[in-house]
């Protein structure tokens, strides 16, 4: 029963998020913020597919232990696409609040993203192993958590400063996103 429920949920989620993202990109009519959100949705769905499709196959067949390498590879790809997702979210912030300059801040965002991706690429992660080291999971998540904290603070401060009713809870959605992602 678990296999059917999880697989069904994952399929609906992947189809929905990728299609919504594609529709947003196609219908953005020059609105760069809208295009960025659409791109984020496609990247999120595509990245998650690398983890969720092997997960669903494993659940519906011989079990997770027989798909260790595929699941590890999916987790690796998802780690990188989530990093790109948050870099794009930074650009949503820049567009929404018409931020110009701030090259130091942009350098920090790209530096944290590069550090995260570099750490994800290290063989010590043992992505394809049945028992990857917890320490490397922590190391690679440090720059990611800092990137997330930075984006959270930017949205919180800007929404408050601009009295942006539509985005007043954006910071909280990012916190929840991290809360759901980090255990994975």
Segments from the language model and where they lie:
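Hydrophobic alpha-helical transmembrane segments of multi-pass membrane proteins
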Residues: 8, 76-80, 142, 146
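Extracellular-loop-to-transmembrane junctions of the mid-late helices
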Residues: 127-153
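Hydrophobic alpha-helical membrane segments
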Residues: 44-47, 115, 144-153, 167-184
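Loop-to-helix transition at the N-terminal end of transmembrane alpha-helices
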Residues: 32-45
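Internal transmembrane alpha-helix with an interfacial aromatic "cap," most often the third helix
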Residues: 19-27, 50-107, 118-125, 153-158
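Membrane-helix boundary/juxtamembrane motif in polytopic membrane proteins
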Residues: 102-108, 133-139, 155-176
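Hydrophobic transmembrane alpha-helical segments in integral membrane proteins
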Residues: 1-19, 137-143
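Anionic, Ser/Thr-rich low-complexity intrinsically disordered regions
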Residues: 12, 24-28, 34, 96, ...
